[in-house]
Each structure stands twice: as structure tokens, then as C-alpha cells.
Amino acid sequence: MVSKLDKYWQHPALYWPLLILFAAATPFTFAPYYHFWLMPLIFGAFVRLIELRPRFAVSSAYLFGLTAYTTQFYWIHTALHDVSGLPDLYAVPLTFLLPAYLALYPALCFWLWKKFTLPRGIKIGLVLPILWTLTEFARERFLTGFGWGAIGYSQITPDSPLAGFAPFGGIHMVTLATAFLGVWLVLASDNTARSGKRLLPIILIAALLAAGYTARQTDFTRPDGSRSTVALLQGNIDQTLKWREDQVIPTIQKYYEQVGKTTADIVILPETAIPVMRQNLPENILAKFAEQAQNNGSALAVGISQYTSDGNGYENAVINLTGYQENNQDGIPYYAKNHLVPFGEYKPLPFLTTPLYKMMNMPLSDFRKGGGKQSALLMKNQKIAFNICYEDGFGDELIAAAKDATLLANASNMAWYGKSNAMYQHLQQSQARAMELGRYMVRATNTGATAIISPKGNIIAQAQPDTETVLEGHIKGYVGETPYMKTGSSWWLMGILTLAALILFIFRNKEH
């Protein structure tokens, strides 16, 4: 049955504008706004709209995804046009290219959903959240993967009980819980259904929120007794100036002075803080940085690009200058970025993209992977598992290093995206990783968001974005494993995929 409100929503003059409006509101559920309560309402309204016009389910889902991802990732245009100087003739269509691809996943979800002939309560209340989560997982994994904008990230805030599921099953379990909450709200608010049918989703909503709240109070990792002070350097180097030859010395001087101003145990510089290949630097530069830190009793990590050991490529690295020896350049401990950004750090289609790179004047666009098995870097009394840039958007890939680490660290340069929401969305992903892995996460960035995050995902300290500053604070080393660290996302997702297949098998057999 259809309520009076639904009759209005069904009308094409309202249906399509409402669909676009709901999708365009999704950015407000994520950082920096953190209106977490809005996402289940948006998701529920979106599902209800599709229920009203099921014939347009796939096209509606695609339009919703296209609108949501375009409004969330508008900062692609900032990187292409404002920073790289690409004319709007190229920048505008290229900005839509990623959202147009990502929108295929919501469309796939509802294409699969239409294949199920099931009672409404099961089809909406059980199967749809499962399919949505599975397609979100596929979006994070297929090709190079891009998990930004998963609805679970909207719940990574101190106020949402659903964030409590992160240490159990990662961000995808939070996504599943968010989708469940959205569709159960639809079923619970259906005033055309019998009161008995509305009672069950109300009970499920209460149970879900209670379970999330309880999970949030549970600790799986523990302090190992070590305490450290950290200093996270934010140079605020304009991206349009960063790689200019006449800016190299001023940039190095700026970071050298910042290192000299802190006596923290651990000092971390951002991604590619020194805009010169390590092997091309005069050897005394790194020696001076190491000496400056040593004089202040600090261990120092520096973001810098370097040639690979075979000399045939280059890596995006963080080098550990603790115990640096000028005559042993090849013995410097380092972490090299492994999950590279397609079209940004390597060229998947060089015959098509090389002319574009020349127009954009992009430096260092063909990095090599650092490899999946890299050890934590020992700095003072902490073993630090580093990741660089958007690597902390892939939780499963951080598990192996985190098991042997007491602290997580991200080095980034978000200056590509100006003063947009990109830095805050990235910060929220780091909050999720801290919760999933049960450890402090520290972030050293060029322009923001430089921050210290607790194992509960709370932002303890944050530097003012777009300023030259040093953020100092205290952290504790943590050990132990969360349930998520033991299984990752794949195993329990395979379980719910099996459940979905079992539901389809049972009900099809009943029909026959």
C-alpha cells in the first residue's frame, strides 16, 4: 500500500528532484560536518523512493550515486583546474569521470536486488543492506579501488553508536549497520502496515543501537606502558610552488627550522616534505636534519621521494633518520608507499594520459610500489606502522604492519585539493583506521588535516589547516589485536554473501 505522502513522492515532478536532493545532502553526513544521524535517514528515503518506482530502480540508483559522489568529490576539479592549471574544457568532464564510474556500484546493487523475489520485509530489511555492503566492498577492491564515500564513514564520530562495529568488522561492518538502520527505519515508519509488522523493525533498531553502543565501550587492545611526545610538522607549502627549483631551499630551510623548535620524542614531516630525490640531495642536508633532531633528543622521520634500489624507478617514501650515518646512505630505514594513486602516481594508460600530464605539468607521476611486506620503523620507544596519503583508506592493507606496531602514522600532502573537504574526509578515514586497529594514529600533513587520533577514533589534537605550524601532543603505545585484525573484511563478508545466496535458494525452492 501507498501512503498519501508516497503518492506525492511518486510523481515524476517530485521523484527525480527528491532523489537528487537526497544524494546532494550526503556530503553533510561526513567530515567536517559530522551529521552522522542524517545518513540513515537519507539512505532510507532513497530506498523508499526506489520502492515507489521499482521500474526505475537501476537508473535511480545510478543517478543517486552520480550526484552523491560528484558533490562529495568536487575537489577533483580543484586539483585539476586550480592547482594543475588544466582548462575547464578538460577539467570539468574529468571531474565527472570518477563519480560516473563509482555510480555503477549502487546501480549494480539494485540490479542484483531486483533479481530477488522475496517478501518485502526480507527483501528490503535484510537482502538490500547485504547487497549494498558487498558492492561497497567491491568498489574498494576492484581495479585499484576507491572506498571514499562509503556510508559507514559517516558514522565515524564520537557520537554515533554504530562506529562501535569498526573494531569488529572494519568500515564495511559499519556500512552494513548503517544500511540496516536506514531500511529498518523505512519498515518501522510504514503506517500502512499492521502494527505487528512495524514492531519488529523497531525492536531491531533498538537492538542495533544498543549493540553498537556496547561495542563502543569494549577495549581489545591495551597500552604497553610506553608514552611518547610527538611533533607533527605542517609546512603549508603551496602546491603550485612546491616543485619549483627556486623554492627547494626555502622549503628545506622551513622544515629544518621547525625540527629545531621541538624537543618531542618523535618528529614526523609530511609526504614529500623535501621536494628533491633523496639521492640527489647533498649528503650534508640529511645529516643536518638528523643532527638537529638528535641535539633535541628527537627521532626524526622525513617524507621524501627516492630512487629504487635498482635505479630504474622512484618511490614515495618516509625515511627514518634516527641513527643516521652519512657514509651509509643505502642503510637508511624507510617505508615506501605501496598502494599508488592511479593517474596521479602511476600511468595505467600512458599512451592516453602522457599528453594530459604534460598539460598539467605534473611532477613524479610514475612511482613504483614499495611492496606489501614492510616492517614498522623503530623510533624511540615506538614501533610505527607508516602509511602515505590515501593508503589509510584501505583498512585491510594496514593490518599486517599494525600487528607488529605500537603506533600508526600517516604522512600526506593534501595541498592538491586546496581548502576543500578532501582533507577532512581523509581525516575521518584515519579515525576509522585508529578504531579498527586499536592504536593511536598521528597524521603529519602539508596543509591539513594534521592531527592526533586516539584508539577510539577521537581527535585529541588538530592543527589549524592552511597554516605553518607544529602540532605537539602525547601518545601511548598500544599492543594487541581487535577482532577485525584477526579476520579483516573478507571472511565475514563472504559469510553474508553466503547468507544472501541461502535466502534466495530457500525462497525460490518454496515458490517451486
From Swiss-Prot:
Metabolic or biological pathway, per its Swiss-Prot or TrEMBL entry: Protein modification; lipoprotein biosynthesis (N-acyl transfer)
InterPro entries, A to Z: Apolipo_AcylTrfase, C-N_Hydrolase, C-N_Hydrolase_sf, LNT_N
Purpose: Catalyzes the phospholipid dependent N-acylation of the N-terminal cysteine of apolipoprotein, the last step in lipoprotein maturation.
Protein name: Apolipoprotein N-acyltransferase
Family annotation (PROSITE patterns): CN_HYDROLASE
Gene Ontology MF term list: N-acyltransferase activity
Lineage, opening ranks: Bacteria, Pseudomonadati, Pseudomonadota, Betaproteobacteria, Neisseriales
Gene Ontology CC terms, in alphabetical order: plasma membrane
Transmembrane parts of this sequence: 5-25, 56-76, 92-112, 118-138, 168-188, 195-215, 487-507
EC top class, as a word: transferase
Subcellular location: Cell inner membrane
GO process terms (BP): lipoprotein biosynthetic process
Predominant cellular place of this UniProt entry's protein: membrane
Gene assigned in the entry: lnt
Keyword terms: Acyltransferase, Cell inner membrane, Cell membrane, Membrane, Transferase, Transmembrane, Transmembrane helix
Species whose genome carries this gene: Neisseria meningitidis serogroup A / serotype 4A (strain DSM 15465 / Z2491)
E.C. number(s) listed in UniProt: 2.3.1.269
Annotated membrane topology: Multi-pass membrane protein
